[in-house]
Amino acid sequence: MSLRILAKRSSSIWMKTRVTPALISPITITTRFNSTTTTAPSHKDDVRPVDPKISKIVQDISQLTLLETSSLINELKTVLNIPEISMPMGGFMAGAAGAGAGNVPSSTGEAGSGAEEEAKPEAKTVFTVKLDSFDTKTKAKVIKEVKGLLGLSLVEAKKFVEAAPKVLKENVAKDDAEKIKKTLEDLGAKVSLE
């Protein structure tokens, strides 16, 4: 059978099974194009005039590079006197959110108990885990554990361990940091928490 005959047959079959626009109901078309599940809702009715000053700031910020944005954030934190809050690797902790709010005025207008909090030394809850050294006899086990902790390849983990002293993880919660330290010390490594 030649290609020409095969093409004619497949084209005639396609023409017979093709759905024409007249066969599609108008309900299907309107449902498809008016569906809110696939498109974002339109807020054209709720458009408020934007101050040109704000519009210009938005335009300028949206054109910044990542480094420029980081500089902007740091400068705003300095100018607005916003404290640096470090988040642990495990995620959001409710205690960490309230820790920086000691001197913020309450809804009654009273200042927080900032003097009382400054008198008590704060217990450190976030640590940096540092691999100081390791026992050469258990080097392979330490490499395997570091590989699992950091998600590195075997070669990367070997280079990492051999470059000790080196920081393993930063901003680790106290419990996790102690677990990592105990695990690595059981394998013959010397680990410090900072």
Swiss-Prot record:
Compositionally skewed regions (Low complexity) per UniProt: 105-114
GO molecular function, one term: mRNA binding
Glycosylation sites: 34
One Gene Ontology cellular component: mitochondrial inner membrane
Region annotation Disordered: where it falls in the sequence: 101-120
GO biological-process terms attached to the record: mitochondrial translation; translation
Disulfide bonds: none
Function: Component of the mitochondrial ribosome (mitoribosome), a dedicated translation machinery responsible for the synthesis of mitochondrial genome-encoded proteins, including at least some of the essential transmembrane subunits of the mitochondrial respiratory chain. The mitoribosomes are attached to the mitochondrial inner membrane and translation products are cotranslationally integrated into the membrane.
Note: Present with 6900 molecules/cell in log phase SD medium.
Name of this chain's protein: Large ribosomal subunit protein bL12m
Source organism of this protein record: Saccharomyces cerevisiae (strain ATCC 204508 / S288c)
Taxonomic lineage: Eukaryota, Fungi, Dikarya, Ascomycota, Saccharomycotina
